[in-house]
């Protein structure tokens, strides 16, 4: 029925976060992560919140978010730290296996 069609998987509409929330959370996982907000003259219109539309996955796959924002950011930080600092030993399969054990195969 959905051969080759893409699906978006994202947070529920009730847990959307701003880019600032994301940067603050990610920076808390990295010791030397420095950032600052630059005020620039806007030459284009930008929406306040960017979000994925996961309605298709929710409707047809009965998919729902399992991870909190904080946990998602922790796993993302862990993956990037592993990728850049541990000899390119990517944690993808380990993270998927842990997710399945915790949320699917309980």
Q: What do these predicted regions represent?
A:
Residues 1-106:
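C-terminal substrate-binding subdomain of Rossmann-fold SDR/epimerase-dehydratase oxidoreductases
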